[in-house]
Amino acid sequence: MLNFFAAAPRGYEYALSLELADLGASDIKESVAGVYFSASLELGYRITLWSRIASRIIFVIHKGPCESPEQLYNAAYGIDWQMEFNHRSTFSIDFHGMGGFINNTMFGALKIKDAIVDRFRDDDCPRPDVARVDADFRIDAHYRRGQITIGLNFSGPALHKRGYRDITGEAPLKENLAANMLMRSGWQKNPVSLLDPFCGSGTILIEAAMMACDMAPGLHRERFGFEHWLRHNDKYWQELLDEAKARASIGITRCKTKFYGSDIDSRIVALAKKNAANAGVLELIDFSVTNALNVKVPEETGYLITNPPYGERLGTVTALLQLYYQLGDKFKAEFGGWNLAVLNSDVELLSALKLKADKQMKMNNGALECAFNLYTVHATNTRRVDPSNINREGDVSDIAVPFVNRVKKNIKQLQKWAKKEGIDSYRIYDADLPDYKVAIDKYLDYVVIQEYTAPVDIPESVTKRRLTDVLITLPGAIGIDPNNIILKTREKQKGTNQYEKIQANKLELITTEYGAKFKLNLKEYLDTGLFLDHRLTRKLVGEKSKDRDVLNLFAYTGTASVHAALGGAKSVKTVDMSNTYTNWAKENFALNGLNDDKYQFVQANCMQWIKTTHDKFDLIFIDPPTFSNSKRMEDSFDVLRDHVPLLSSLIKLLNPNGEIIFSNNKRKFKMEIEALEALNFTVKNIDNQTLPLDFKRNPQIHNTWLLTHGG
């Protein structure tokens, strides 16, 4: 008996061990990312030809302890390589594993290469050449926990490359993954009708058809690793190939299983047909170009096994949640009695199906860890799902009802108000209900959802489910395309992380506010470039700016400065520490046709700039951060602790009877009024005057003060 190792992705070991047992292997032992087994040479060939799960079959030549470079060298040198391959053959080494004395795989490969070359030389034989690409003889070495395994890559190129697929779709599924799905779902033991409504390039259906008609997965491969092996028995191999061809020919004619595949992309369906034709199973599969929500249910019950789109593959998660909910609705309505198996990397998408899984497994799709869930579908009604209603109210009426009702009520009130006010960006929901802790802002035809950090006593699973329900129901509640929903997570700000990018891609819009135009960037940063709660504060700045010199400190994107300029300010100076936001402020001025020299922009640490400037102003708007410990600032800043010295430092910048509009977002902020009055300030709280209607539900969103200095 010979010793072999069947390599496979992690998570496939159990299915692979069952398959090897069915094929006749003995001494089966599961390991990490593979299975050891024993077999005769003929059985080794058979397993290589018939394994649907394995990635590679390794003929093990040596296995033993290895604790040093010398032991590794000696292990390789001790093999009689002239028994394995001819010196005229090229060879290569694939080394896997690190740890101990091996800090990189190249080191291990070079040690084995040196040992092989030295062994040929010491046996008075010319040394074979190394070929990095398309070597005749590929040596495979695995190092793990002080053990080295050296062997021949018996199978050659990865076994998932069956030979029937030349080109793949946008998000291909490996053939051995598809085979594993079919086996673990239970379909292989009960090959009834099979449907894949997201068939892509057809991999699941083709693999299933090959199983059903008894076709060896390696039958279409052109190359195997043992072909240049000196112990190769071509007679055995040719007999196995002839047997496999005969079995496939008989199996195709006898196959009664029906296969159905569809995809929304006609080009991908054409590719699936080509792949099926290459595999010799096209006549068994009924392909169609169809939206998954329009798929007709076959007359006979069976299995629906699929790998639908998910965030890493296609589309946005928000839009996909809508799709998954509709799919779950369709399954329950039309697929009663069917078995369902779904592969997905996002458990939140699977939860949107609103189906209870009979079994949940982990299964890798390449480097991506996925969930593979099995369901038995029980019919709940007989209505058909209309995919054209995907965003209309009623489709999701059975979940998050209080949230949906509140959002509908809010939007009905706010739409008329916003139109009257002359604004097209506003907040429609702000954690109104304790179970749904999100803020929802509408920017023209887009919505940004900000998820607040949940209390520690709320289980993460509950928080995720509630957020999923929000994302599913919101498009229908307010009549918006789910692709136009952006999700962000808002946590307590620390230092400068409001400046950090959260996504590489941009989504820029132009919004209008009381006649002013502002650029928005909905995706790239946590904030969008416009603080909606300060809308009336900006308007107030504009109303107070006519014929006055205005200063905007901690100016962000300069929106208050724009209002000041449009309000007729004599001059406007905009100061912010961020180069990004200073340039953004300049863009906002350009959008409004404000290109005069009297509008100046300063990128500087505001605290330092206040100390050094000699400019005077009639109106100062200052909206400092609640807390900051930026690297560009010498000391940290806390608005509660430091607001008095900050405001006192502005006195020298004020003209007689000058005013300061001071705002911050510190909840439970307490103004040191007596200390400020001692500095000759008149202090007035103007929260009610500056809190917009869309923020009335959350009066603590900010606090605003008007300070007038007596001179």
From Swiss-Prot:
Protein name, as recorded: Ribosomal RNA large subunit methyltransferase K/L
Stored PANTHER family: RIBOSOMAL RNA LARGE SUBUNIT METHYLTRANSFERASE K/L (PTHR47313), RIBOSOMAL RNA LARGE SUBUNIT METHYLTRANSFERASE K_L (PTHR47313:SF1)
Function: Specifically methylates the guanine in position 2445 (m2G2445) and the guanine in position 2069 (m7G2069) of 23S rRNA.
Keyword entries, A-Z: Cytoplasm, Methyltransferase, RNA-binding, rRNA processing, S-adenosyl-L-methionine, Transferase
GO cellular component: cytoplasm
EC number from the UniProt entry: 2.1.1.173, 2.1.1.264
Localization, UniProt: Cytoplasm
Top-tier EC class: transferase
Superkingdom of this protein's organism: Bacteria
One Pfam family linked to the record: Methyltrans_SAM
Reactions it catalyzes: guanosine(2445) in 23S rRNA + S-adenosyl-L-methionine = N(2)-methylguanosine(2445) in 23S rRNA + S-adenosyl-L-homocysteine + H(+); guanosine(2069) in 23S rRNA + S-adenosyl-L-methionine = N(2)-methylguanosine(2069) in 23S rRNA + S-adenosyl-L-homocysteine + H(+)
Molecular-function annotations in GO: 23S rRNA (guanine(2445)-N(2))-methyltransferase activity; RNA binding; rRNA (guanine-N7-)-methyltransferase activity
Gene name, Swiss-Prot/TrEMBL: rlmL
UniProt family annotation: Belongs to the methyltransferase superfamily. RlmKL family.
Domain THUMP: 43-154
